[in-house]
Amino acid sequence: ADLRPDDAIQGEEYGLKDGTSGWTWVLDPIDGTRAFVAGLPVWTTLIGLVDDKGDAIVGIIDQPVLDERYIGYPGGAELETASGRHPISVSNCDDLREAVIATTDPFIMTMPEQGAWSHLRATARIVRYGLDAYAYARIAGGTIDLVAESGLAPYDAAALIPVVRGAGGLACDWRGNPAKPGGQLVCAASQGILDQALISLRRSAE
């Protein structure tokens, strides 16, 4: 705030502080509250920077228990740990049948959304739940290939999109339009996986 006093700030805990620069910092101090309460090290702190068009440009996904900080920006993504910082990239998986996919909790989806997810679950090789924003970090790190979620708030998503894209992944809504922070979001390691997933997801797109 001292270095960028004209920027807006939006957070889950703070609401919106207006700015005049056209830039908005979007903050979520603890994403994955249930994991935090349970003592599971998959909760994260999220910091996103959104431009005046509503596009997420820079993102940070920080997991202090594991000492992992994922940083995404136009043209690159990095993982910072105690041993230093190094570039990261998505996996080379191009087939949903070979993919590791994730969502936080399918039971918070609408019934049509659950139907779309069920088709993805039946097709993918491995399915994981309950990772919240950390699942998107692991797309960037190359161990998860697709995440699909719905009902996201801006503070849930603004940090995630730049990290995935910076690592070479893709992010869009369930119609296949370029992702904006919030709502329905699908991120994938490759165009092949994304195209296969959208066949199902478009049926329940908002």
Regions found by a protein language model. Name each.
Residues A1-I30, L170, G192-I199, E206:
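N-terminal subdomain of lithium-sensitive/metallo-dependent phosphomonoesterases centered on the IMPase/IPPase/PAP
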Residues E12, D62, S150:
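Conserved residues at the C-terminal ends of beta-strands
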Residues V50-G54, V65, P74-G76, A82-S83, ...:
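Short loop segments at secondary-structure junctions
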